Amino acid sequence: MIHRRALSIMAAVCLLATAFAINAQPAKVPRIGFLGMDSGMQAIRVAAFQDELRKYGYVDGRTIVIEYRWAEGRFDRLAELAAELVALKVDVIVTAAPPSVRAAQRATTTIPIVMTVHDPIGMGFVGALAHPGGNITGSAFQDSELSTKRLDLLRQAVPNLTRIAILWNREGGGYASVQAVETAARTLGIQVLLLEVKEPGDFATAIAAAKAWGAQGLAQHASPFITKNRKILLDQLAANRLPASCELREYVVEGCLMTYSADLNMIFRRLAYFVDLILKGAKPADIPIDQPKEFEFVVNQKTAQSLGLALPSSLLLQATEVIR
């Protein structure tokens, strides 16, 4: 009887020990894959993304692990880097440019992808903004609205603007998104010359062609390739005294006349919201893609002076930042 009781006690102790061991096992730490184009260019935005994640309780190295993979301007590496993240079995992939979103989309149909691009429907990433329908969701902005505003602001800066060159690269989203700029220009009564660049050496040829055609300004279409080679572009714009509306604030800091764009720091913060939803079990197919509500209009007054442009006060008052 005593022997049987001892065995029962031992069995109970073993069960309790097993239960404690199970409870003591650490919870699975979510792993986020970040597929980026350029670590230097996106450093500020990544910091904003991480800061917002902390507000949701996610701290890199403690409550989450973020696996970064950077192409550093080499688009041919994106497929390999996306495959690495898939092999790591990350819980979600975050990415923010058409080429990198495309690479992630091709690498997996099951791992959720949180992205930000312009015109995700036109580029085939989602079926609809309200119901994406696949494994991709995030934040997006529409070319048509931004293009019209950018051209209108450039027209306010350049008197009698009737001819404009549009600089583009296919890796920025393709011709479909360039058409939005063309349509916006025609709406404003502006003639358009399309100039595609594929290699760094194409910039000088393109700007020379724009000047020969009689372009009074240039609109730069969003493109990771152009961003990578922006110094070449900005040098050519300065040498040819051509006013331009560029893609990002960084261009304006470095010498472009102006930019009107969604506030990308705020967009990257917003991506943390989507990551939180997914880590809590939401399906990307059911998470509506939202559109930014905050935009920045940055003007370089020094560049305007070098171009001989007297920017009207009505234009400067619209700016969120004036670089002097």
Predicted regions, residues:
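Short hydrophobic alpha-helices and adjacent helix-cap/hinge residues
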Residues: 1-324
